[in-house]
């Protein structure tokens, strides 16, 4: 049996992972689960999977979790130290589905634990950890398998042949506002931004998809994960979301990975790697009336060019951290209807342009410091703009 941990088990990816593990209880021993605040679901999952540990990050819900797990053998951990403890448990495979920069330190703890395979759904840890994180993983022979469908697709192709690659193509659905004008985007509401046409996702990533900042972060992630220069990474809008990624080789051949739009598929791949699992998803191309591709609208969705500017800047690592931090702040403010939809990317741009606390990034504390300063600056920029509420 594979020993596994799932950090962030109550989010959208975490729940999908738990569902898969429940179907295959004879294959996996769940050592630990973690959640930020959803103690009720965490307790339920821990019971169903016979987990040894359950960690709740928000200390306010420690007693609730303890009460829900009374009479079980599940050990409860709490707060940042508790999350660090369960992340440090050596397992065969750790699924990391924590949202945002909060996932970075747990990823590093998992790498240091002796765990050899990380199924990673937290792109922000790669965006902010960059070469520092990947160097640590390489030194300890840790295999990182991306769960994002696009990177998972590229990973699968490059596993077979990573020589003579011309470029990689990441596909983007275009989000719910494909072909909208700038004027139309100006009045987008929170509910509209959360209604994705093809994927079922959490709130933060749904907004990121709507602004196409998700693809911007994925470009930075791909640059690090696959050690490929920014000018050899391309994003193409593909509304049907059937083709997830393409590797173009120098001899003119291109290898694409096709699959239905359900995150269970890349999660199952990561759980089973290096083997392949059996799922009921069978793509029927005869039922696909069309597969369309188009250039992104850089005028309406400038986040893609922003990611390229960051990677080609004189301080790409620092600017990547700034971009991520400012985006997390801006998305949070948009979700509270405190800034408008178009202002999300404007806040990110302005934060990068005005950030001046540059230094070498040599440790986790350096990353945390830049992240902290970026958040302060992003909040100041939002305050200077005033409230722009969209009902």
Swiss-Prot record:
Uppermost EC category: oxidoreductase
Keywords, alphabetical: Isoprene biosynthesis, Manganese, Metal-binding, NADP, Oxidoreductase
Cofactor(s) the record lists: Mg(2+); Mn(2+)
One Gene Ontology molecular-function label: 1-deoxy-D-xylulose-5-phosphate reductoisomerase activity
Pathway assignment: Isoprenoid biosynthesis; isopentenyl diphosphate biosynthesis via DXP pathway; isopentenyl diphosphate from 1-deoxy-D-xylulose 5-phosphate: step 1/6
Positions with a binding annotation for Mn(2+): 148, 150, 218
Binding-site positions, NADPH: 10-13, 38, 122, 124, 202
Single Gene Ontology BP annotation: isopentenyl diphosphate biosynthetic process, methylerythritol 4-phosphate pathway involved in terpenoid biosynthetic process
Binding site for 1-deoxy-D-xylulose 5-phosphate: 123, 149-150, 173, 196, 209, 214-215, 218
Catalyzed chemical reaction(s): 2-C-methyl-D-erythritol 4-phosphate + NADP(+) = 1-deoxy-D-xylulose 5-phosphate + NADPH + H(+)
InterPro entries from the UniProt entry: DXP_reductoisomerase (IPR003821), DXP_reductoisomerase_C (IPR013644), DXP_reductoisomerase_N (IPR013512), DXPR_C (IPR026877), DXPR_C_sf (IPR036169), NAD(P)-bd_dom_sf (IPR036291)
Enzyme Commission code(s) on record: 1.1.1.267
Database matches in SUPFAM superfamilies: 1-deoxy-D-xylulose-5-phosphate reductoisomerase, C-terminal domain (SSF69055), Glyceraldehyde-3-phosphate dehydrogenase-like, C-terminal domain (SSF55347), NAD(P)-binding Rossmann-fold domains (SSF51735)
UniProt xrefs under PANTHER family: 1-DEOXY-D-XYLULOSE 5-PHOSPHATE REDUCTOISOMERASE, 1-DEOXY-D-XYLULOSE 5-PHOSPHATE REDUCTOISOMERASE, CHLOROPLASTIC
Family membership noted in the UniProt record: Belongs to the DXR family.
UniProt function note: Catalyzes the NADPH-dependent rearrangement and reduction of 1-deoxy-D-xylulose-5-phosphate (DXP) to 2-C-methyl-D-erythritol 4-phosphate (MEP).
NCBIfam families xref list: Dxr
Protein name per the record: 1-deoxy-D-xylulose 5-phosphate reductoisomerase
Organism: Wolbachia pipientis subsp. Culex pipiens (strain wPip)
């Amino acid at each position: 049996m594979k020993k596994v941990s799932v950090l962030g088990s109550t989010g959208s990816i975490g729940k999908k992972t738990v569902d898969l593990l429940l179907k295959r209880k004879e294959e996996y021993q769940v050592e630990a689960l973690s959640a930020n605040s959803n103690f009720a679901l965490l307790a339920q999952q821990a019971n169903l999977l016979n987990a040894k540990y359950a960690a709740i990050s928000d200390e306010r819900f420690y007693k609730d979790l303890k009460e829900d797990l009374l009479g079980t053998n599940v050990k409860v951990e709490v707060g940042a130290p508790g999350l660090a403890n369960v992340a440090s448990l050596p397992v065969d495979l750790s699924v990391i589905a924590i949202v945002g920069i909060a996932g970075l330190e747990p990823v590093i703890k998992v790498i240091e634990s002796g765990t050899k395979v990380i199924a990673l759904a937290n792109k922000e840890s790669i965006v902010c950890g960059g070469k520092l994180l990947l160097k640590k993983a390489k030194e300890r022979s840790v295999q990182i398998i991306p769960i994002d469908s696009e990177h998972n697709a590229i990973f699968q192709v490059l596993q077979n042949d990573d020589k003579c690659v011309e470029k990689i193509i990441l596909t983007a659905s275009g989000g719910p506002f494909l072909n909208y004008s700038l004027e139309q985007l100006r009045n987008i509401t929170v509910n509209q931004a959360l209604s994705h046409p093809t994927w079922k996702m959490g709130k933060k990533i749904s907004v990121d998809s709507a602004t196409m900042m998700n693809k911007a972060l994925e470009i930075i992630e791909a640059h690090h994960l696959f050690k490929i220069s920014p000018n050899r990474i391309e994003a193409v809008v593909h509304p049907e979301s059937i083709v997830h990624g393409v590797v173009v080789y120098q001899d003119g051949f291109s290898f694409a990975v096709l699959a239905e739009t359900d995150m269970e598929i890349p999660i199952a791949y990561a759980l089973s790697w290096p083997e392949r699992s059996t799922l009921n998803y069978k793509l029927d191309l005869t039922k696909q009336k069309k597969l369309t591709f188009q250039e992104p609208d850089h005028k309406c969705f400038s986040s893609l060019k922003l990611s390229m500017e960051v990677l080609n800047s004189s301080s790409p690592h620092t600017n990547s951290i700034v971009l991520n931090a400012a985006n997390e702040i801006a998305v949070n403010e948009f979700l509270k209807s405190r800034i408008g939809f178009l202002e999300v990317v404007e806040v990110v741009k302005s934060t990068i342009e005005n950030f001046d606390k540059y230094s070498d990034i040599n440790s986790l504390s350096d990353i945390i410091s830049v992240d902290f300063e970026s958040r302060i600056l992003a909040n100041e920029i939002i305050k200077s703009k005033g409230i722009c509420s969209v009902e």
